[in-house]
Amino acid sequence: MLYELIKPYSSVSLIGMCKNAGKTTVLNRLIKDWRRMDESIALTSIGRDGERSDLVTNTKKPEIFVYDGTIIATAEKLLFAGGNLSDSGNDAQKNGMNSGISREILDTTGMPTPMGEVIILRACSDGFIQLAGPSMTAQLARLKKRMFELGAAKVIIDGALSRKSLAMPAVSDSAILCSGASYSPDIRKTVEDTCFSAELMMLPQTERTEYVHQCKQKYGVFFGSGTHGGEQTEFSELSRAAELVRKGGAEAVLMRGGVPDSAANALIAAGRALNGLEIICEDGSRLLLSHKNYEKLVRAGARFTVMNKTRLLAVTVNPFSAKGSHYNKTEFYDAMCSGLGGRVPVLDVVSEFGCEAAE
């Protein structure tokens, strides 16, 4: 099922609600599925992944297994990480490491990481690897383009922690949100927070796309065709845009960049003027406000839309916790399905992928 969901898209980001959410298990399943379909894939990460044990929790975790022909973008120092990448058996022995996969270097990127420059290579054998890619979304977008130029048919970006900016359409065509019991001992909190994150990723695209792209400032207030004559007013400061909304009559407000709680509070002060107001942001990853303030705005009659819609393909659930507070897998799956209301498929990494534990 996972392969069929992703098949129409050229790139996908795996986004974790927390560490040990099941991302590596999902990634390995995708790699295996695409191998069966004989498609060329490329892998990178916005953080480090593939190590044998979690560097924070010190718990055992699954490694990333790749096949001959896979394109990989990873940090230079990981080229000789134990049991991972090497030019040859002799090189591995010289560095005191066991040979993992042999590889062919395709390109250097000039993108720095704490573990050295990001190098693009092709696996020449099957084996385990570690990933560590660039930390900036703009760099990921450029890296993705280069991997396509080098022959990749699909690109998978493995996210670190809660880097929901990976869901930006500029970074990938689609996203999978991974949640698990490691997020919180409280199953209700995990479900509620995951459903809220999913809701932000599924916000509809505004019908005012043409007009909002014409807006040059960070904020814009749009009026209808009534007494205001279809006007739009642009501002560089939120306070001035919020003040105009409070005066009433506005149909929409555009907010570029991040939208934190301070921005939400400025709009909440508009009171009745929020009824029917469309709040437009660039994409769901820019909404940094709390669930509480989001609900306040929605209850006041506002609705959220985005300039660039994210394609959330699935939410995966992992009932196992690295901290020991496991969930009942049926209860967790059912609660997530109920919370999402059928708007997106929910996949249990234990039942779907036939594993007893997942990272």
Kindly give the residue locations of the regions a language model identified:
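Phosphate-binding/switch loop-helix module in NTP-utilizing enzymes
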Residues: 96, 102-164
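Walker A (P-loop) phosphate-binding motif
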Residues: 2-36, 41-46
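A generic structural motif
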Residues: 43-46, 277-285, 344-355
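N-terminal phosphate/diphosphate-binding loop that engages ATP/GTP or pyrophosphate donors
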Residues: 30-121, 333
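Conserved catalytic-core segment of NTP-binding enzymes
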Residues: 88-93, 136, 140-154, 159-340
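General beta-strand structural signal in soluble alpha/beta enzymes
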Residues: 42-46, 133, 154-159, 177, ...
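N-terminal charge/polar-biased segments
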Residues: 1-10, 36-40, 331-359
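Short active-site-adjacent helix-start/loop capping segments
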Residues: 21-22, 50-54, 81-82, 164-166, ...
